[in-house]
A protein has these predicted regions:
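Conserved ATP-binding module of the ATP-grasp superfamily
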Residues: 124-126, 147-150, 167-202, 235-237, ...
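ATP-binding N-terminal substructure of ATP-dependent carboxylate-amine bond-forming enzymes
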Residues: 1-104, 135, 366-372, 378-379, ...
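Peripheral (often C-terminal) accessory segments that flank ATP-dependent C-N-forming ligase machineries
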Residues: 25, 120, 137, 312-418
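Short, well-ordered beta-strand elements within core beta-sheets of diverse protein domains
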Residues: 162, 199, 241, 300, ...
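ATP-dependent carboxylate/phosphate-activation module, predominantly the ATP-grasp catalytic core
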Residues: 168, 198-265, 269, 276, ...
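Short beta-strand-to-turn element immediately C-terminal to the catalytic PLP-Schiff-base lysine
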Residues: 131, 161-166, 211-213
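A conserved helix-loop-beta module that forms one wall/lid of the active-site cleft
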Residues: 94-160, 182-185
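Short, flexible turn/loop "capping" segments at secondary-structure junctions
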Residues: 152-155, 232-233, 376-381
Length: 418
């Protein structure tokens, strides 16, 4: 199984799970990438380096060339990394291996093309327009109206996304987003740095994780997102299963399935983000891959569905074997802790365990002594992600509240004072 783009080090657990399932992994990534260590750790059988420039056609050819030189003919190709979905789709297609069509994956990868195709297909679509300059942003505002959202065409984790409420705010917001949306800030923007302005969506947001097989949805898990930290839309957390109005959630799931089917994303594990708005269900974005962070652990804990195994089987054209629990087996709360202020991180006083929980994972993203940005900088630094599983949602929430009762401590200080 060729894995194209191993992603950040937190993705190591996905590769370990694939190895546990018996997959012989060959990782293809940029020279010097951390994933080379997966071979010495016994997780992967081989690793190949291939240059990445951000153009999907060029990057796919580089992968094909590396495989040809190594004399490797894979049985399947996959990725769990957003940056690499278009490359993986092209490599699979070139080798005649299972996967979604490159044009369908491209339409999901580009938030602008997602809106254009969705509107063309007659699906309910927020107003949106491409933006390459401040003048174009003003022109787009005349079409989209306010409130609106400025976001990058290519991105993840709400990076560079910000709400705008009036014309006077446009120059400052444009300047702020432009500083973020660059390859120097994050490699994901090697794919392009165009922006879009789109209609703001009210309501409650959800993550919808789908398992598709031959165009049919076999399984859908819904996680309910908590209100984001506007104006930046940084995520604050979620819980699973969802507790929102069931009929509204069902309508959103139906729209998610209809959207991926209409796009031509007929197989594998997909991650769709949407909202139940005052005007009905709306799609925020479509990801032609499994959800990131701890989503696959959450889905397995709650519904007894292994999304990694489902994706592996799909990429090998093996029949699906998922048997979801009829009722939630447990409940999960995932909390993202941001820096409360700008300065030097003095303490992260989390408890390292919680009584009576099924599972607890704390992923630290910052260390004591680091300079951190608070909400005054719009995009606050993520300090930690806490995932707690308990017998029910009420218990999971209570245990999480106890765990996080002492907030992070930040003291005044400049980045040079470490």
């Amino acid at each position: 199984m060729v894995v194209i783009g191993a992603g950040y080090e937190g993705k190591r657990r996905a590769h370990i799970r694939m190895a546990e399932l018996g997959a012989r992994l060959l990782i293809v990534d940029e020279p010097g990438h951390w994933s080379e260590s997966l071979v010495s750790d016994g997780v992967a059988v081989a690793w190949l380096g291939a240059p990445v420039v951000g153009d999907a056609d060029q990057d796919a050819q580089a992968v094909l060339d590396a495989l040809a030189v190594a004399g490797i003919r894979p049985d399947g190709v996959l990725t769990f990394w957003e940056d690499s979905v278009c490359v993986a789709a092209r490599v699979a297609a070139a080798l005649g291996l299972p996967g979604n069509p490159p044009e369908a994956v491209d339409a999901a990868r580009s938030k602008i093309r997602t809106r254009e195709l969705s509107a063309h297909l007659g699906l309910p679509t927020p107003r949106a327009q491409r933006v390459r300059s401040l003048d174009e942003l003003f022109a787009a505002a005349a079409y989209v109206g306010f409130p609106a959202v400025v976001k990058p065409e290519f991105g993840a984790s709400a990076m560079g996304c910000i709400r705008v409420d009036d014309l006077e705010s446009l120059p400052g917001i444009y300047s702020l987003v432009r500083r973020i949306v660059s390859p120097e800030h994050n490699a994901i923007f090697r794919a392009g740095n165009d922006l879009l302005l789109e209609e703001y969506l009210d309501g409650v947001e959800f993550d919808v994780d789908l398992v598709m097989h031959e165009g049919e949805c076999l399984f859908a898990s819904v996680s309910e997102n908590w209100p984001t930290a506007e104006p930046s839309f940084q995520e604050t957390g979620l819980h699973c299963p969802a507790t929102h109005d069931r009929k509204a959630v069902r309508r959103l799931v139906d729209l998610c399935v209809q959207t991926v089917q209409s796009f031509g994303l007929w197989s594998g594990v997909l991650h769709v983000e949407g909202k139940c708005t005052s005007h009905g269900p709306r799609i925020i974005e479509v990801n032609a891959r499994m959800g990131g962070a701890r989503i696959h652990e959450i889905v397995e804990a709650v519904w007894n569905v292994d999304l990694i195994e489902a994706q592996l089987r799909s990429c090998l054209a093996l029949p699906p074997t998922i048997k979801p629990s009829r009722r939630p087996r447990s409940a999960a709360v995932n909390t993202i802790v941001h820096a409360p202020a700008t300065g030097r991180l003095a303490a992260l006083p989390f408890a390292d365990r919680a009584a009576d929980c099924v599972d607890l994972t704390i992923d630290l993203e910052a260390e004591v002594g680091d300079h951190v940005d608070g909400p005054d900088q719009v995009f606050a630094t993520v300090l930690a992600e806490v995932t707690l599983v308990a017998k029910n949602l009420r218990r999971a929430r209570a245990l999480t509240a106890d765990l996080l009762c002492n907030p992070p401590q930040v003291v005044p200080g400049s980045p040079l004072e470490r």
